[in-house]
C-alpha cells in the first residue's frame, strides 16, 4: 500500500483546516494529521525579550513526534488509520485499497526539511493582512492574544517564516484564501485526483 502525501499550509486563519477537512471528506481512504496537535506544553514554549510566548516557530512544536506519526502511517497505513487517526470516517476506509491519501495541515509544515522531503503536492493559502488580523481577532485562543500581539509578533513571524519557506522549496501552489471555499476545494481536489491517477498508473 502506497501513501500520497498532500501538504496544506498557510498563514494563521487562512482556511487551512477548512480546506483540509473538506478534502478529507471528498477523498476516500484519506486521513489528516494536523500540526497544531503537536504544540509543546505551554511551560516550555520559547519566550521573547518582552515575555511573549513564541508559538509561531518550529521550536514551539514537537516536530520529531509529528514525523514519527507520519512515518508510522507511511510504513503501515492500515494499522495507523485504525488505531490513531481520529478524523478518519469509518465509511471512507477500504482495507484493500492500494493508495492512502495523507493530508498534512499546518502553518509551518513547509519550514521543516524532513517533512518537506515527503510531500507529493504542496498548497499554501494566503489572505491579506487586514483580513488575517480581523479573523484572528474574532477567534478565541488559549491563552488569549495579549494586546498588540498580532502586529508585534504574529504578522512579523509570518513574513519571516514565509521568506524562509520560499528559500527552502519552490514547487508550492499558492491559493487565494478569499476565493469561495467551493472553488478552492474543487481546484485542489481535481489536482490531487490527477496525482492519484498518476501514482496508480505507476503501481500497475
Mark where each language-model region is.
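Short hydrophobic/aromatic beta-strand immediately N-terminal to the Walker A/P-loop
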Residues: 6-7
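Conserved nucleotide-sensing/catalytic segment adjacent to the nucleotide-binding pocket
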Residues: 31, 40-89, 101
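A glycine- and Lys/Arg-enriched "phosphate-lid" helix/loop adjacent to the NTP-binding pocket
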Residues: 50-53, 113-164
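Hydrophobic positions on the alpha1 helix immediately C-terminal to the Walker A/P-loop
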Residues: 19
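Conserved lysine of the Walker
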Residues: 16
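NTP-dependent small-molecule kinase module
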Residues: 2-3, 97-99, 138-141, 156-204
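Post-Walker A helix-loop "phosphate-sensing" segment adjacent to the P-loop in P-loop NTPases
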Residues: 25-33
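P-loop (Walker A) phosphate-binding loop of NTP-binding proteins
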Residues: 11
